Amino acid sequence: MSKLYKAAMTPEVFAWAPASNNRALIAGKASYILNSVSAYRSGQKKVPEIAKDVYFVPPLRGPRGTRWTSEHVIYNYIIPKYSRNVDTAKKFLLALVENYDQAMYYSELYNSPAFFDTRVPKGNRGYPSVRGAKNMLDLHNAWFDKDPFALPGEATDKLKPLKDAMKWSTNVGHPGPANPAIGEVFGTFVVPNMMANAARGLKPETAVMQAETLTKVIFEKWRKKGLVGGTT
């Protein structure tokens, strides 16, 4: 990590917020980021010439030859038992699934469906019809093969590598399951801070030990709540 920082990064990365890599990319300061299509879409609108030079690839392979990346955003919909509108909420979720073609299109392919077998509703859907598209998977593949939001003169197949994202995407916490403890480790930046400390000169062994200590405290807290299994 220290070598990567010294060879390819600048001090500002230590103060990055969630959108900082987006801004660095469209400012022409970053050559590689790990992000969804949102950074690219921002570039198309704000700095078209930069966006035209942005491309997508699967995750880089690690030293063991595997390559994984975490899902960027996963929407979760929960209907509380105490809700006064349970039936209405269920109808809304069903309607959302049935009409996710529009969610895909109007999010400019930022959103992808969870249920690929869902049939595409008939009639005017508010976007140019896609010949032969019978279900959400057909639409998804057609749009990622030929991006309907590509700029004039821009390659339309840039998103094609993302069609196989399910093969190399996994949950935060892989190879274990996602759980509240993993969520807190992720949300409080335990691992990024470990990397940052090592990049700034802290002995790698010390950085790892500090991160391990914090992680154990977090897991123990959630074990006491009965929401994480295992032992210390």
Regions found by a protein language model. Name each.
Residues F14, N179, V190-N193, G201-T232:
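Conserved N-terminal structural module of periplasmic/extracytoplasmic solute-binding proteins
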Residues D53-P63:
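Flexible, solvent-exposed loop/hinge segments that line or gate ligand/substrate-binding clefts
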Residues M1-K46, V57-P59, D87, A207:
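Extracytoplasmic ligand-binding clamshell segments of periplasmic binding protein
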Residues M1-K6, N22, I26-A27, L34, ...:
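Non-transmembrane alpha-helical segments in soluble domains
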Residues S38-I50, P63-H72, I78-G187, L227-T232:
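C-terminal lobe and pocket-closing loops
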Residues A27-A30, D53, I74-N76:
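Extracellular structured ligand-interaction cores
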Residues Y5-A8, Y100, A198, L202, ...:
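A general structural signal marking secondary-structure boundaries and capping sites
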Residues E184, T188, A196-A199:
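A short, solvent-exposed beta-edge/loop patch
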